């Protein structure tokens, strides 16, 4: 978190580093063929879904570079391009990059698990589907998912939440989060928070 209380201002730093690395090494991002999720089994496969994450990152990187190039050609200054003209694209790309790293780490971690593998797979899949739901319009427009599966994704997501909910206490315990930290309001109005019984954003979350 920054002094302004918004970690999104750091995203420009992430993207500037990404652009610098990409210009020297284009293989830094996904360079394979773009796929299409057309089968339910592919939707439930984390490795297949991770390719979509990489495609989203590549799409948003290309979109940003193209817009920056056009603006630069029209005489816009580097400052105006970064701070005003491409602010939304920069934030979206930084988020996509972080989510790609997260899903790849999830897959790597899953391969090292045994007893808790199925439990954690459900939670990793929930994370992945939440991202896909947010990016569903892009995926449909680009032909990365068939319309039928796109229409069923929310139903699969809700069903998996119900399935995973029974393990939530075990999962929280496995993260070794101190009990007192579960009761701390992470980002709420403290005056309002203390005006009524509120047992923490984690414990009290309505999932």
What residue spans do the PLM features occupy?
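Flavin-dependent oxidoreductase catalytic core characteristic
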Residues: 1-207
